[in-house]
Amino acid sequence: MPRRRIVGQRKILPDPKFSSELLAKFINILMVSGKKSLSESIVYTALEILVQRSSKSHLDAFEAALNNVRPTVEVKSRRVGGSTYQVPIEVRPVRRNALAMRWIVEAARKRGDKSMALRLANELADAMEKKGSAVKKCEDVHRTAEANKAFAHYRW
């Protein structure tokens, strides 16, 4: 492992429509095979559908959905004397957002709706109401961390 310098976090350009870095990151996570314009159109269409259903603005609705999926703790495997323990650790804010976005995209891809924009809109709507696959994933992670609270002293 090189020891020269610490590589900083790359600055992401905000998205063109709402000038939000969070939304730009979400578009990048949704993107497949470098098709960014397709990813942008899917996200913007999904946000339009979401705004029609709720009384919130585009970014407020997206932020509300993301807030309900963000994990606060997760477990990491730690080997201590021949046995592996699942040690609960706090999640850093950047990783919190990344995990939430990844879970929402994965849950949307697994849905059976017609278009990806509709699937994404439905998943975001479910996340706003604290239901759906992405929220369930977050709750499962929290439950696992809670169950392994006894091993918290193995933190590093």
From Swiss-Prot:
Alphabetically ordered keywords of this record: Ribonucleoprotein, Ribosomal protein, RNA-binding, rRNA-binding, tRNA-binding
A Pfam family the protein falls into: Ribosomal_S7
Any one of the GO CC terms: small ribosomal subunit
GO BP term, pick one: translation
InterPro entries hit by this protein: Ribosomal_uS7, Ribosomal_uS7_bac/org-type, Ribosomal_uS7_CS, Ribosomal_uS7_dom, Ribosomal_uS7_dom_sf
One GO MF term attached to the UniProt entry: structural constituent of ribosome
Keyword tRNA-binding: yes
Gene3D superfamilies per UniProt: Ribosomal protein S7 domain
Keyword Ribonucleoprotein: yes
Disulfide bond residue pairs: none
HAMAP family registered for this protein in UniProt: Ribosomal_uS7_B
Subunit relationships: Part of the 30S ribosomal subunit. Contacts proteins S9 and S11.
Biological function: One of the primary rRNA binding proteins, it binds directly to 16S rRNA where it nucleates assembly of the head domain of the 30S subunit. Is located at the subunit interface close to the decoding center, probably blocks exit of the E-site tRNA.
Family per record: Belongs to the universal ribosomal protein uS7 family.
Name of this chain's protein: Small ribosomal subunit protein uS7
Protein source organism: Hamiltonella defensa subsp. Acyrthosiphon pisum (strain 5AT)
Gene, per the UniProt record: rpsG
